[in-house]
From Swiss-Prot:
Organism expressing this protein natively: Cannabis sativa (Hemp)
Catalysis: reaction(s): hexanoate + ATP + CoA = hexanoyl-CoA + AMP + diphosphate
Annotated positions binding CoA: 290-293, 615, 681
Regulation acting on activity, per entry: Inhibitied by high CoA concentrations.
The name this protein goes by in its record: Hexanoyl-CoA synthase
Cellular component GO terms held in the UniProt record: cytosol; membrane
Lineage: superkingdom: Eukaryota
InterPro entries: AMP-bd_C_sf (IPR045851), AMP-binding_CS (IPR020845), AMP-dep_synth/lig_dom (IPR000873), ANL_N_sf (IPR042099)
Sequence intervals crossing the membrane: 242-262
Chief localization: cytoplasm
Tissue specificity comment: Accumulates in glandular trichomes, especially in female flowers. Present at low levels in roots, stems and leaves.
Length: 720
């Protein structure tokens, strides 16, 4: 890293001027840099932190940010820290305050302080689930049960992989807990804040807890008027706006099961999910508004031959489509329960293992896995938010997502169960209106996926907006890019990016960053609380703990909130069959390639089936893509696949690419191929060679934004 940049003690004022900074400002900034280098050296983490705090700002050229970051860490090695926790500020975080109060009780003589004792506490959370989860769920998050569980964890059948029973005997309703008044939430607290695209100069819309409760109760009564059997499935297929959140909570509150369907899905994909879930009704919208476009949604639901639909207008009160016989409008649906307006709805308390939500994995071939969330899964989602993202009362959380995949429900529970506000922008997150919404809503945690950040950096649409209220960013969904996330941190005065890696079947994350640890870009600093990771060697057995290495990831089978069933598959075969045993327990399959670096950070290298063998060297697509994405400024993004030649032999490396300007006809494919070769041979391995480059208008992606390399491998013959 940073080999092409000067070390900081060699930087002079003219280097600032060469980046377009005026001579007067350059002299001032160089003076500050010289003072920092004198006090902290030219290449230490403290040097960088002082540069981030006292020199850099969002309005300075990003090339200056790069020069100083990469120059500071020129010879550092893997995973240099981009953010370091402040020992005093840590004490006010959720985990820091807990450890200050009870650290010695939990860890005894091992406890020193929240920062140096964090890894010991993570291990404690795995070894002592009874203490850890009781503390977090009951004492800290104030989760209430109508019938208390007999214990936190029962392990009657140790020979049954993943067969642990969490909170046995307990009854609760996770939606009711979102609406409860407790020390984290008061009736006049703002719980949802939102704005519609196009209304970017209008005041924000807000719902207090009192108002949210009344809306959810009314929908709960209206659901009961439909006469559906308790426990049946009801689908939601619409953008994630305030009504969608109200409907989601009401379905769970009333004892039904949400079926999550993304609003981007085609009619066949909608039909598949309705069939697998056996949904009895569906909430949807007539159209989706994106800028000046109206994208039909209800017509896709009709084409999917859905059960009865309740249809919400995308704007105003009139539905912009003719309804099928048996379908009803949102207004009529609510009108049937008008006599119960403002009346409290009695939540249906359920056993912990009762289903609340059916979600679907983003499969690239075949039928998607139908994964049920129970009443426990929302608690896992919220606990990750509490411990790793430090979500708490007074926070404002925005994450561009949809109830059709796991980050939608995750956002609902991680915010509301921790007393934070959900911030919703009803429109595209790729426009300046979204950046203004982040500013106006005073967002404290901004969730992203890397492709959104790439677009922001490319278009500079966030320029000029004040993001100083942000305490952290969070990222999930796909591997991120160091340079792009350095740029992102710079938009909010170098607040940390807390990376998270998990899955729908986990209900949250198994690896993440933490406010109690130094954060490195595109890295995970820890195993999640209550989780254990294992990296398998080439023979399929776990490597020694804390030994640096790379291989397929396996998970400890005892994970709070993780799935135990699939509606359309054999859960044991998918997650446990053929996995190694450690200490008498069969490990759980995940399928990612993970790396543990020499300084203790985890890196994700994509799916195990996204690795290739180039010249006898096994490497992940993501490692190749990270290099290729930086080769040519005209290239927006790339993806790499290995293709065996006809007749057999070593895999050939093929790079698909998308241009920033789709109308650019000046690109020379052979020259680009040579540029990719040069970059790969310089940064990865001198034996790597790109055989073909293929232009595309866009990369095929799943609904959760993962690149479908498998599809490209299948389609490559067409390019031939």
């Amino acid at each position: 890293m940073g080999k092409n940049y000067k070390s900081l003690d060699s930087v002079v004022a003219s280097d600032f001027i060469a980046l377009g900074i005026t001579s007067e400002v350059a002299e001032t900034l160089h003076g500050r840099l010289a003072e920092i280098v004198c006090n902290y050296g030219a290449a230490t983490p403290q040097t960088w932190i002082n540069i981030a705090n006292h020199i850099l700002s969002p309005d300075l050229p990003f090339s200056l940010h790069q020069m100083l970051f990469y120059g500071c860490y020129k010879d550092f090695g893997p995973a240099p820290p981009a953010w370091i926790p402040d020992p005093e500020k840590v004490k006010s975080t959720n985990l820091g305050a807990l450890l200050e109060k009870r650290g010695k009780e939990f860890l005894g003589v091992k406890y020193k302080d929240p920062i140096s004792s964090f890894s010991h506490f993570q291990e404690f959370s795995v070894r002592n689930p009874e203490v850890y989860w009781r503390t977090v769920l009951m004492d800290e998050m104030k989760i209430s049960f109508s019938k208390d569980p007999e214990c936190i964890l029962r392990r009657d059948d140790i020979n049954n992989p993943g067969g642990s029973e969490w909170l046995p005997g307990g009854y609760l309703n996770s939606a009711k807990n979102c609406l409860n008044v407790n020390s984290n939430k008061k009736l006049n607290d703002t719980m949802i804040v939102w704005r519609d695209e196009g209304n970017d100069d209008l005041p924000l819309n807000k719902l207090t807890l009192d108002q949210l409760r009344k809306r959810v109760w009314l929908v709960g009564y209206a659901l009961e008027e439909m006469g559906l059997e308790k426990g049946c499935a009801i689908a939601i297929d619409m953008p994630m706006h305030v009504d969608a959140v109200v409907i989601y909570l009401a379905i769970v509150l009333a004892g039904y099961v949400v079926v999550s369907i993304a609003d981007s899905f085609s009619a066949p994909e909608i039909s598949t999910r309705l069939r697998l879930s056996k949904a009895k009704a569906i909430f949807t919208q007539d159209h989706i508004i994106r800028g000046k476009k109206r994208i039909p949604l209800y017509s896709r639901v009709v084409e999917a031959k859905s059960p009865m639909a309740i249809v919400i207008p995308c704007s105003g009160s009139n539905i912009g489509a003719e309804l099928r016989d048996g379908d009803i409008s949102w207004d009529y649906f609510l009108e049937r329960a008008k006599e119960f307006k403002n009346c409290e709805f009695t939540a249906r308390e359920q056993p912990v293992d009762a289903y609340t939500n059916i979600l679907f994995s983003s499969g690239t071939t075949g039928e998607p896995k139908a994964i049920p969330w129970t009443q426990a899964t929302p608690l896992k989602a919220a606990a990750d938010g509490w411990s790793h993202l430090d979500i708490r009362k007074g926070d404002v959380i925005v994450w561009p997502t949809n109830l059709g995949w796991m980050m939608g429900p995750w956002l609902v529970y991680a915010s509301l169960l921790n007393g934070a506000s959900i911030a919703l922008y009803n429109g595209s997150p790729l426009v300046s209106g979204f950046a203004k919404f982040v500013q106006d809503a005073k967002v404290t945690m901004l969730g992203v996926v890397p492709s959104i950040v790439r677009s922001w950096k490319s278009t500079n649409c966030v320029s000029g907006y004040d993001w100083s209220t942000i305490r952290c960013f969070s990222s999930s969904g796909e591997a991120s890019n160091v340079d792009e996330y350095l740029w992102l941190m710079g938009r909010a005065n170098y607040k940390p990016v807390i990376e998270m890696c998990g899955g729908t079947e986990i209900g949250g994350a198994f690896s993440a960053g933490s406010f109690l640890q130094a954060q490195s870009l595109s890295s995970f600093s820890s195993q999640c609380m209550g989780c254990t990771l294992y990296i398998l060697d080439k023979n399929g057995y776990p490597m020694p703990k804390n030994k640096p290495g790379i291989g397929e990831l396996a998970l400890g089978p005892v994970m709070f909130g993780a799935s135990k069933t699939l509606l359309n598959g054999n859960h044991h075969d998918v997650y446990f069959k053929g996995m190694p045993t450690l200490n008498g327990e069969v490990l759980r399959r995940h399928g990612d390639i993970f790396e543990l670096t020499s300084n203790g950070y985890y890196h994700a290298h994509g799916r195990a089936d996204d690795t290739m063998n180039i010249g006898g060297i096994k490497i992940s697509s993501i490692e190749i893509e990270r290099v290729c994405n930086e080769v040519d400024d005209r290239v927006f993004e790339t993806t790499a696949i290995g293709v065996p030649p006809l007749g057999g032999g070593p895999e050939q490396l093929v790079i698909f690419f998308v241009l920033k300007d789709s109308n650019d006809t000046t690109i020379d494919l052979n020259q680009l191929r040579l540029s990719f070769n040069l970059g790969l041979q310089k940064k990865l391995n001198p034996l790597f060679k790109v055989t073909r480059v293929v232009p595309l208008s866009s990369l095929p992606r799943t609904a959760t934004n993962k690149i479908m390399r498998r599809v490209l491998r299948q389609q490559f013959s067409h390019f031939e």
